[in-house]
């Protein structure tokens, strides 16, 4: 069976030229990137978001954004991102043990950006393309038959398309339909206080100014690590305009699973965890300015890979956190959502209007093993920070660096999917095994640092 060549990794198809209609449920990172990528590949998109309005990417994800509008979208987002040259690794006394470069996340590669800023930028670009985005529109029911799939919006209006893509996050209703049941998260026993607020709130407090010493030039990031899984990451953002911090802890009874839900978290509770640190006066001087409405306490959860991402009828599937919720510590939730979205758009383009079911099956074949391996990375990464042996670390500071495997950070999803689609499609049609090229050689996540930063032209 022949395969269309498509417009290629950097190509843009005429709007609506594929004749494939796609309903996307959820307009977070995965949903908005899927809407934009599908539009660029000639598909007709309707995006649904139950909220009334719009509410950290590695180098593997920014390759996708670089292809939009001659790189202008990425340039704008980078201008709103954080500029961190290296992360300082310290003990609770403030002794510096390692400097971890931001290779894979730094300027010219990936970016460190507040989720709300990123989502807003994606939304503005999608809106500029004229994509049909509908807010206050909850998908309350799902259905499919041999020729189409659809949803009921707000319990009233039925809309149909060639396929439905659920990008509706960790509490996905689309996933419930796909599986036929709800899945429960597996608590890790960890939680994290999380806050981001304007650095202007530090004005007038001389004890807090140390964190802003490089404001206007670049940002700084400090990670304090101690025993028992307790740690603090404290940084500035947008060259000193924002202050961002997280406290990882095990007292998670009041924590919420969502990154965004503001709970009754109190900064006093976070500070109490750090009160025995020699650096407490210094860090408390900054943290105590956190507004209560900017603070959340969320649970670090884990989920096993789903048995499938696709419905029995084959026209409804999940992507992003709905398909493979990542531990926050892995730093790949947004990146893998972007890769899913790009893969979806290309597979629909290459399969064509008459083979939408096949396209969604190929998406799963190309993406499933990669995301499953990354889902399993949280424990390996966290083990670096749990109960550190500072004497050993002082002899070999590299052991505290964040893992940067080449197969993950060096991945070009556009190029890979265009090249691999025929092979993955044949495996689906013949019901044979398929090994994607986007996974490590031993099919396991390992703490390695073999990613090589691209040389500037």
Swiss-Prot record:
The active site is at residues 194, 224. Keywords: FAD, Flavoprotein, Monooxygenase, Oxidoreductase. Its EC number is 1.-.-.-. Its cofactor is FAD. Pathway: Alkaloid biosynthesis. FAD-dependent monooxygenase; part of the gene cluster that mediates the biosynthesis of the mycotoxin meleagrin. The first stage is catalyzed by the dipeptide synthase roqA which condenses histidine and tryptophan to produce histidyltryptophanyldiketopiperazine (HTD). HTD is then converted to roquefortine C through two possible pathways. In the first pathway, prenyltransferase roqD transforms HTD to the intermediate roquefortine D, which is in turn converted to roquefortine C by the cytochrome P450 monooxygenase roqR. This is FAD-dependent monooxygenase roqM. The gene is roqM.
């Amino acid at each position: 069976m022949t395969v269309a060549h498509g417009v290629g990794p950097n190509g843009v198809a005429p709007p609506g030229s594929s004749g494939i209609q796609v309903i996307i449920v959820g307009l977070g990172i995965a949903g908005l990137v899927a809407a934009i990528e599908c539009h660029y590949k000639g598909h007709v998109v309707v995006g649904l978001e139950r909220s009334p309005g719009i509410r950290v990417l590695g180098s593997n994800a920014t390759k996708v954004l670089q292809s939009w509008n001659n790189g202008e979208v990425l340039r704008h987002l980078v201008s709103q991102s954080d500029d961190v040259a290296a992360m300082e690794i310290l003990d609770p006394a403030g002794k510096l043990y390692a400097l971890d470069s931001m290779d894979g996340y730094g300027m010219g590669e990936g970016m460190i950006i507040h989720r709300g800023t990123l989502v807003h930028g994606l939304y503005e670009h999608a809106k500029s393309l004229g994509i049909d985005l509908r807010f206050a529109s909850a998908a309350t029911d799902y259905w499919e038959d041999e020729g189409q799939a659809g949803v009921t919006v707000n319990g009233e209006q039925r809309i149909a398309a060639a396929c439905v893509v659920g990008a509706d996050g960790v509490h996905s209703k689309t996933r419930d339909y796909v599986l036929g049941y709800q899945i429960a998260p597996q608590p890790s026993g960890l939680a994290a206080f999380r806050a981001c607020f304007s650095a202007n709130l530090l004005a007038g407090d001389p004890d807090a100014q140390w964190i802003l010493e490089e404001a206007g030039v670049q940002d700084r990031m400090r990670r304090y690590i101690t025993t028992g899984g307790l740690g603090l990451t404290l940084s500035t953002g947008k060259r000193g305009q924002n202050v961002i911090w997280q406290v990882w802890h095990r007292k998670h009874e009041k924590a919420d699973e969502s990154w965004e839900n503001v709970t009754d978290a109190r900064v006093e509770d976070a500070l109490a965890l750090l009160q025995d640190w020699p650096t407490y006066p210094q860090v408390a001087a900054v943290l105590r300015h956190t507004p209560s409405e900017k603070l959340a306490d969320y649970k670090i959860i884990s989920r096993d890979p789903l048995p499938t991402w696709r419905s029995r009828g084959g026209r409804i599937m999940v992507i992003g956190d709905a398909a493979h919720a990542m531990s926050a510590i892995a730093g790949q939730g947004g990146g893998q959502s972007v890769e899913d979205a790009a893969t979806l758009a290309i597979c629909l383009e290459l399969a064509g209007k008459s083979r939408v079911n096949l396209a969604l099956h190929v998406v799963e074949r190309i993406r499933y093993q990669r995301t499953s391996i990354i889902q399993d990375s949280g424990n390996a990464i966290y083990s670096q920070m749990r109960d550190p042996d500072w004497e050993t670390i002082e002899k070999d500071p590299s052991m505290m660096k964040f893992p940067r495997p080449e197969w993950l950070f060096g991945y070009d999803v556009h190029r890979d999917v265009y090249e691999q689609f025929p092979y993955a499609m044949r495996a689906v049609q013949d019901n044979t095994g398929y090994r994607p090229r986007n996974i490590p050689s031993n099919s396991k996540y390992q703490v390695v640092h073999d990613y090589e930063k691209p040389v500037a032209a």
